[in-house]
Each structure stands twice: as structure tokens, then as C-alpha cells.
Regions:
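Conserved redox-cofactor binding core of oxidoreductases
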Residues: 1-47, 65-68, 114-118
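Conserved active-site and cofactor/substrate-binding residues in soluble primary-metabolism enzymes
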Residues: 4, 21, 34, 50, ...
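Solvent-exposed alpha-helices and their adjacent loops that cap or buttress functional pockets
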Residues: 13, 19, 31-33, 47-50, ...
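Short, glycine-/Ser/Thr-/acidic-enriched flexible segments
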Residues: 27, 44-46, 55-57, 61-63, ...
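A sequence-level detector of short linear motifs
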Residues: 38, 49-51, 150
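Glycine-rich loop(s) and the adjacent beta-strand/alpha-helix scaffold that form part
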Residues: 49-120
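An anion/pyrophosphate-binding glycine-rich loop and adjacent beta-alpha core
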Residues: 93-95, 99-186
Length: 186
């Protein structure tokens, strides 16, 4: 999982004597003569410029930005719950686009999942899988009007969860109810 991946990366960073700048937020790229020369940050609310030979934007996506979700995924996505971190707000992508970078890849798609309607707006990363509701192949899914809107048995869950998660967004109140009989146990 992500937490263990970060732990191993931090060990490598420390072993190589690289400084980690905590309590910092990147605000802009330092861009001169068609070259990214560094990054502007807010460090404990104080603006600083950090110059570097190279800059890597390892900053995540935009899933936690309602505005960017709506712009790239379409109407209705501003209200979607996020199964990941609340910190992926697209700031790094916005900085890159601002200096002329081209968006690459599929910005109009995402891995949406059935998510607990009473769960938090953003998942607790230590228990993120607890909020995902992906047992639909063993029951039926209906919307708030009592209508089925997906074929729960279309394929294995691994091949349908993102597609079905997107379908929930299109439903009244963005709700899908999973219904099971007494034979299904979790």
C-alpha cells in the first residue's frame, strides 16, 4: 500500500542525504528562458525560492479539486467523494499548464468506486478499503428511484468497479444501493 511505499522512499532519501522540506507548499515554477530553474514555495507561510538543476513534479492528480473534477470529468463530479488523499488538488498540474505544458493522458477518466455514502469526504488512507463498497456482483444495485442501472454480473469486479462508480454519479442524488439476500456474508 501507499504508506509502505512512502516509508521505503523516505529511507532511501535519508540514506542519500537528501533534505525533505516539510511544512511547504509549492506555489509556482521558476521558469526563465524556456527552462524550469526551480520552484517558489510557501514555507511556514513565508515565500521562498528554491533553485535546482532539475525539478520533478511528483505531485499527484486533481481528484481532490471539485473545480478540476468538474472541468475534466464533467458535471456532477464536484460532489463525488474521494477515496484518496485530500491533498491531490492539481496544484502541480496547474503550475505546469501555466508555463505551457501539454496535458497528457486521459484527463476525462478516473477510477471511481462505490463509496459509503456516510463515509468521509476523503478516505482515511489507513483504512481506505473499508469505505469502498465493491460486493455488487453478489447482489443487485438500484438507484434512489428503485431502478437497476448496471449489469452487476457483466464481468469480474476488477473490470467493472470504475465503470460502475462513474454510473453512480449519473444517478439521482449520486446514490446507488447495493442489495443482497441472506446468503451473502461479508
Amino acid at each position: 500500500q501507499g504508506e509502505k511505499l512512502i516509508d521505503s522512499m523516505v529511507k532511501i532519501i535519508k540514506k542519500n542525504g537528501i533534505k525533505i522540506q516539510y511544512d511547504s507548499a509549492a506555489t509556482d515554477l521558476i521558469y526563465e528562458d524556456n527552462i524550469v530553474k526551480g520552484v517558489e514555495i510557501l514555507y511556514k507561510n513565508k515565500p521562498l525560492k528554491i533553485f535546482a538543476n532539475s525539478v520533478v513534479l511528483a505531485c499527484g492528480g486533481f481528484e481532490s479539486s471539485p473545480e478540476m473534477r468538474t472541468r475534466y470529468l464533467g458535471p456532477g463530479w464536484e460532489m463525488a467523494k474521494v477515496r484518496g488523499t485530500k491533498h491531490n488538488t492539481g496544484d502541480g498540474l496547474t503550475m505546469a499548464l501555466k508555463i505551457g505544458a501539454s496535458p497528457y493522458g486521459n484527463w476525462s477518466g478516473c477510477h471511481a468506486v462505490f463509496h459509503d455514502m456516510n463515509g468521509p469526504e476523503f478516505s482515511d488512507l489507513k483504512i481506505s478499503n473499508k469505505y469502498r463498497k465493491i460486493s455488487y456482483p453478489w447482489g443487485i444495485v438500484i438507484n434512489a428511484d428503485g431502478e437497476r442501472f448496471v449489469d452487476e454480473g457483466e464481468d469480474f469486479r476488477n473490470y467493472t468497479y470504475a465503470k460502475f462508480g462513474r454510473e453512480v454519479i449519473k444517478q439521482p442524488n449520486q446514490i446507488g444501493w447495493q442489495i443482497f439476500d441472506h446468503k451473502v456474508r461479508h
